[in-house]
């Protein structure tokens, strides 16, 4: 359920196809996201999951699965 929501948010923020995403999908390499795209996605994630994701944590979040692991450990 969480993974599906993350994929939906990423698809909306990055203009990507949710059906082509897996936990291994890289935001930058596979989806062509730039810093602004990632910023928008993180803001949407924070709002949806009611968490704060500090900027320093973002360097460890490169894939859909990274987001899921991060949110599960919050």
List where the protein language model places each region.
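Thiotemplate assembly-line natural product biosynthesis machinery
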Residues: 1-19, 72-74
């Amino acid at each position: 359920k969480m993974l599906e929501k993350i994929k939906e948010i990423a698809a909306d923020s990055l203009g990507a196809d949710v059906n082509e995403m897996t936990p291994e999908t890289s935001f930058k390499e596979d989806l062509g996201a730039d810093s602004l795209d990632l910023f928008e996605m993180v803001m949407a994630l924070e709002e949806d999951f009611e968490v704060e994701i500090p900027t320093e944590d973002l360097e460890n979040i490169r894939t859909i699965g990274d987001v899921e692991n991060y949110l599960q450990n919050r």
